[in-house]
Curated annotation (Swiss-Prot):
Keywords: Signal, Vacuole
Pfam families documented for this protein: Fasciclin (PF02469)
Protein name: FAS1 domain-containing protein AER383W
Compartments where located: Vacuole
Keyword Oxidoreductase attributed: no
Length: 250
């Protein structure tokens, strides 16, 4: 989003709007008469548990840091100041985190996936296995469920093998992505949410159980294993949850 603010000898505040989180509204402080940006009482929600609040907090912190930098530069620029905050999308965020760089490469290998994760109008959760988790898998994402060794032994063409590898990688990535969640259809228990990965139709019963216990999150896969969420990273159009194992390990 691109806004242009004219500063006429006084300090004007700008908080960039985020499609992801909330549109701040203007209120007048009755005691001081000053205009303030505040959060509406009803926060528009796109994600389960408390992830909308996490997004709001991180967005406001980033915007505050941007404002501070902009105002430090005022003495070096004309009085007219252009503010720009397009935000870091999930596609960029995945590529910026070294601990999940392998998963980021698999994402880039899937046609259309980078474009989806770069779409600012989407609301997406990504459960990204660490490099160590992927390296420790008995079979790598491109090796199953289509058995590449057997295809080669059977004399499959290079094109057939390539297509099988692409299908395997796509399946692996989609198992770890949840797009545009319909919260009215999310199965809930106290402190938990049942989500459906992009591998399956939204009408299908969920295959990911996300739980919160205090300040910690865990994820249960279809195999029933509890995986620890090691880190949570926000982007302008979603959340990255770094997990210590694959949701689809063979």
């Amino acid at each position: 989003m691109r806004l242009k603010t004219i500063l006429l000898g006084f300090c004007a505040f700008h908080v960039a709007r985020s499609k992801m989180v909330v549109n701040l509204i203007n209120m007048i402080d009755e005691q001081t008469g000053e205009q303030r940006k505040v959060v509406p009482l009803e926060l528009e929600r796109f994600f389960p548990l408390d992830f909308d609040e996490i997004l709001l907090r991180d967005t406001m912190q980033r915007n505050a840091a941007m404002e501070e930098e902009d105002y430090r530069e005022l003495g070096k620029r004309d009085i007219e100041v252009a503010f720009q905050n397009t935000g870091v999308t999930l596609d960029d965020r995945l590529q910026s985190l070294p601990a999940i760089s392998l998963f980021g490469r698999y994402v880039r290998d899937i046609d259309g996936m980078s474009e989806a994760l770069a779409d600012g109008d989407r609301h997406i959760m990504v459960f990204a296995p660490t490099n160590d988790a992927i390296t420790a898998m008995p079979k790598k994402p491109w090796e199953y469920p289509r058995n590449i060794d057997k295809l080669e032994q059977a004399g499959a063409s290079a094109s057939e093998i390539h297509d099988a590898i692409q299908a395997n990688v796509r399946r692996f990535v989609l198992t770890h992505v949840v797009s545009d969640i319909d919260l009215s259809k999310v199965g809930r228990e106290d402190g938990s949410a049942v989500l459906t990965s992009d591998l399956h139709p939204k009408s299908m019963q969920g295959d990911i159980l996300l739980r919160k216990d205090g300040d910690r999150y865990t994820v249960s896969s279809k195999t029933g294993r509890d995986l620890a969420v090691e880190e949570v990273h926000t982007a302008s159009n979603g959340i990255v949850l770094v997990i210590d194992s694959s949701l689809d390990a063979e």
